Amino acid sequence: MPVVTDPYKPGTPCWIDLMASDQQAALDFYRDLFGWQGEIGPAEFGGYAVCTLGGRPVAGIMAQSGPEGQPLPPVAWTTYLASDDADAAKAAIAGNGGTVLYDPMDVGALGRMLVAADPTGAVFGVWQAMDFIGAGVVNEPGALVWNELNTADTGAAGRFYQPALGLRPATIQGMDGYYSLNVGDRTVGGMQGIPKYLDPGTPSHWMPYFSVDDTDSVVDAVVKRNGTVIQPPFDMQSGRMAVVKDPQGAVFAVIQAPEAQLPDSP
């Protein structure tokens, strides 16, 4: 099992969480689909549930919430990028055309976080680890394996993430329009335009990919549990993948990748 025990390097996707309209139903869905274990957490943390796989943190699930009198945020997955200093990240985000949606805040002794949007509108989080580094297992069936930025303007996004958060875009030979996102010499994610298989008008967003043993059987399981198939299973260079939507509307991808192609960490 690819276990992570050291803090993630700044800019690296380190955690994901889901804002759900029905937290318990979401916990049940992902337990049945991926084998996650989790329960609604303490009230002092808003009931936030840290789900585990093999006893290690894999993702968070929380109930929809927002400022009083404001519309609730959409049901969606949020990718968090690691940072050594959330307050410095806030300044860098604002200074490079991003928008800080929630100012840096402490999460007990676990860490310090903020939520922001890049200049193309994609929402993401920033996590400054203290006692909690983020995902403790990756690249294992049921765990996070890839994070992809689908954006209406790859140029604007690329110009933002490198100076703001240390994510450097690079072209990939033979994959026109698709870019790797790199921290130092390590690829930690990807970036592309909004895929045609998504609904017209879909805003820019980060999409998580989960590793699976069998893409087709997982897609069948999603459908049986009242989810929706957005992009049916298909083969690509890095494996067999599909894009689906859970019963509450959160979109994510699953991929069955050859073991030799799995990275050590996301």
Please place each PLM-identified region on the residue numbering:
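N-terminal beta-strand motif that seeds the catalytic metal site of vicinal oxygen chelate
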Residues: 1-24, 76-79, 127-158, 170, ...
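Vicinal oxygen chelate
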Residues: 12-21, 49-52, 67-92, 112-117, ...
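Structured core of small recognition/catalytic domains
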Residues: 155, 161-264
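Short, positively charged
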Residues: 91-100, 220-225, 266
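Core segments of cupin and vicinal oxygen chelate
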Residues: 2-3, 8-10, 14-56, 95, ...
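Conserved short beta-strand elements that form part of the metal-binding/catalytic scaffold
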Residues: 36-72, 118-119, 123-130, 168-203, ...
